[in-house]
Every structure is written in structure tokens, then in C-alpha cells.
Design a protein with these regions (language model features):
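Short, compositionally biased P/S/T/A/G/V-rich stretches that sit at domain boundaries
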Residues: 16-56
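Short edge beta-strand/loop segments characteristic of extracellular beta-sandwich folds
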Residues: 60-67
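Exposed aromatic-hydrophobic patches
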Residues: 63, 98-106
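Extracellular Ig-like/FN3 beta-sandwich strand-entry sites
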Residues: 72, 111-113
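Conserved aromatic beta-strand anchor motif in extracellular beta-sandwich/beta-rich domains
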Residues: 77-81, 118
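Surface-exposed loop/edge segments in extracytoplasmic proteins
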Residues: 83-90, 124-127
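Short proline/glycine- and polar residue-rich coil/turn motifs
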Residues: 92-98
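Short, exposed beta-strand-loop hairpins at the edges of beta-sheets
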Residues: 107, 115-131
Length: 135
């Protein structure tokens, strides 16, 4: 499975849409604003957000944006298929705001339920995003 990750600068993050719902904070004030699954990234924004993806798209992305990053740190995107850890991607964050993403290349065996856990440097779960891959 091929995995690729990228990051956005604080200025680029300013163009991101805001998110409603729960905001996760850790003890240092790291604030996760948005976590979405999507079909791509264009102009530093998620494209075609969804929770069900067709094998035909070939690749799935998890886009995360952090509204407050008090210091340089890392987060993890842990990709699980049917409750089995498939891959972990370590992503760097920079103050004061940051966006980042990771992706997986889809294979025929990847059909079914998935979840992605976003964890902070201390391995505390900030958010869980569930999605499925279908024909």
C-alpha cells in the first residue's frame, strides 16, 4: 500500500473552511478543527468529502486542520481496516496553525469498513473518522 502525506502552511490554512462539531484539545492547547475523508486535495482544501468511497477513485485522503498549534509537534494518522491497523503516518505540525493530510492507494482487498484515528504526540486520540470502501 502506498502512503503519501503533505502539509499546508499557516497562511494556506486561513483559506480553509471552518468545521462544526466537537473540538479536541490536548493539555498543551493543540486544537483540532477539522478532520475529513475526501477524494483529493486541491488548492489546500479537501475535495469531495465523503464517508463512502468507490474503489474506482483509487486513492483516499484524510485532511486535518489544526486551529491552534502552540509549539512544533507531531500527530499520527492511524489507518484501520476491519479493526486491524494497516498503516501509521507521522505528520509534523508548526505553530500557530497548520493543516496536513495523508492518503492510501486503494486495492481490491481494501473494500469494507475503515476508521482513521488521529492521535497527538502523546498518542492521545483526538478524533476518530469512520468511512467505507465499496465496489
Amino acid at each position: 500500500m502506498v502512503l503519501w502525506a503533505g502539509s499546508l502552511t499557516a497562511g494556506e490554512l486561513m483559506a480553509q473552511e471552518s468545521v462544526t462539531g466537537a473540538v479536541a484539545n490536548d493539555s498543551r492547547g493543540l486544537t483540532l478543527g477539522q478532520a475529513v475523508m475526501c477524494e483529493g486535495i486541491k488548492d489546500y482544501a479537501p475535495v469531495n468529502k465523503a464517508v463512502v468511497f468507490s474503489m474506482e477513485i483509487g486513492k483516499i485522503y484524510c485532511f486535518t486542520s489544526f486551529d491552534h498549534v502552540p509549539e512544533k509537534t507531531i500527530v499520527y494518522h492511524n489507518w484501520y481496516r476491519r479493526d486491524k491497523l494497516v498503516t501509521t503516518k507521522r505528520l509534523s505540525l508548526q505553530p500557530p496553525q497548520w493543516s496536513t493530510f495523508s492518503s492510501i492507494q486503494l486495492r481490491e482487498a481494501d473494500k469494507g469498513p475503515w476508521r482513521l484515528e488521529i492521535k497527538d504526540q502523546a498518542k492521545k486520540v483526538l478524533r476518530i473518522v469512520k468511512f467505507s470502501v465499496t465496489d
